[in-house]
Amino acid sequence: MTSALTDDRTAVPDGPVGSRLDDWWGRTLSTARRVALWRWAGPLGVTLLAAVLRLVTLGHPHSLVFDETYYVKDGWSIVHLGYEGTWPGNPADDSQPTTDQRFVDGQTDIFTNAAEFIAHPPLGKYLIGLGMLLFGADNSFGWRFAVAVLGIATVFLTAVIARSLFRSTLIGTLAGFLLAVDGQAIVLSRVTLLDGILTFFVVLGFGALLLDRRWTSRRLDAWVARRTAAGRDTLWGPVLWWRPWLIAMGLALGLATATKWSGMYFLAFFAVYSVLTDMMLRKRAGIEFWSSSAWLQQAPVSFLLTVPIAAVTYVASWTGWFVSKDGWDRNWIATGGERWTGVLSWVPDSLQNWWHYQSEIYGFNIGLHTPHSYQANPLLWLVMQRPTSMYYVGTNAGQDGCTATRCGEAITGIANPFVWYAAVVAVVALLVLWILRRRWEYAFVLMGVAAGYLPWLLYVDRTVFQFYTIAFEPFMVMALAAAIGLVLGRRDDPRPRRTRAVVWVGVYLGVVVLASAYWLPMWTGMQVPWDFVRSHYWLPSWL
């Protein structure tokens, strides 16, 4: 998949081929040094764009937005206590400030030592708390700093992974650009929720899995070459105990799971994919018993290289709870809980207490059916039927700088429609093309989408939200960038065809930019006239 704007600098044949833009770009990348510069300038450029869109006015609004009321306060208490502490209840007298108002006004140390039951593991909240330690708990920029930095890093990872996967700096840069300017990605980098943190670790694990695939391919080819040269058979392949990138994947997805349990879905999908990849790589290398070798020899070893690493990482994220005395359920057995008996009676009380806590978290999450006005059925996620409204403040003329009859400040977790819907089409197109062409790159991206989406179809009756899709959106924009590459074609295509493709892609990207500019006030809480706010609700269900 190449175009004139990729790293491919092969000679342009005589005749009317390519576009004039190709001619200019070929002259621009006329040296190896310039090609190397472009390889990093593209991803870094879109990362800089992402940083501007995420960091500028990050501290606005100076109030706890949506579920920041949980994660900001939990982040602050956990870095002090090692577990999430409770906060005072809201006063019955409406004339008195609420707990959130007191926190926003600078009363940040009013949490107590009493433990609070929580629904998610602690790692993401530790990272949030670290940002608050850097900038102060009363600084709303500090509340959101960690999620913003990791959101920016996710754009960079998306760009370099797509560049490596499709061997095209253009496609990688496009993938990073589409994520950089997308509204859901911007909002989840500017509002302190756990999902943006989860996404970073998931994409990190995805990149490690890609590196493992190439590392393993080289080792298998070298093994077969050595065996063949020595006149030995290649019936069974080698057992690869040292796979550093597979270990790194287990670590990254352990960190993802330590942020939100949905990280386990990615671990399961990525681990199975690694075995399937082993199987196909062994077949390609010429190993006779390629299937049995992958499943019977390598799969158990790959399991040991990933799952225990992820499990230890997850448990380690609870260190603050283990060393505390007052964490939730920390003294469950001592206060009447039933100690294990039989073959598990040797397990320390601290681990039994912790396991009971995990079972309570599981029960809470599985049984979460509380109605919410912005809950979104996973069956409708791909059509973006119910994006999440996270913040809205209305003002009248002359109030807080409002110059219209009526103004509003809104933060809505809605994707750029021209990115989201095009990405959905691209995912379907890549699925069809994979069936027809069996390109492993397509399967790799589709696996990332499937890992993030399909498990949620088991919970269509749960209270879940559209913004959960951020965890697999990087893979959707990779699919979209790959589809754009297919539309562009090759630099040696006939000039009329190539020129039309470049123009159409340019028009599409221009529409994406204009749409992002139009939606930006709705992603960042800018004060705008109410009529402008209302114009963004293209579907009744978006309001």
Regions found by a protein language model. Give the residues of each.
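Start-transfer (signal-anchor) and selected internal transmembrane alpha helices
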Residues: M1-L53, Q297-A310, R495, T499-V505
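Transmembrane helical bundles and short interhelical boundary loops of multi-pass, membrane-embedded
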Residues: S3-A4, G237-A248, L253, D278-R282, ...
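Membrane-interface transmembrane helices that cradle and orient dolichyl/undecaprenyl
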Residues: L21-W24, T28, F166, G205-W245, ...
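Transmembrane-helix signature of polytopic, membrane-embedded enzymes
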Residues: W40, G45-V46, F141, T158-V181, ...
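Short helix- or helix-capping micro-motifs
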Residues: A50, A175-A180, V187, L253, ...
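Aromatic-rich transmembrane-lumenal/periplasmic boundary elements in polytopic membrane proteins
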Residues: L58-V104, Q297, V301-S302, A310-R386, ...
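Short acidic/glycine- and proline-prone juxtamembrane loop motifs at membrane-interface regions
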Residues: L64-V65, V147, S164, V187-I197, ...
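Transmembrane-helix motifs of polytopic, lipid-linked glycan transferases
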Residues: F145-F166, L204, A429
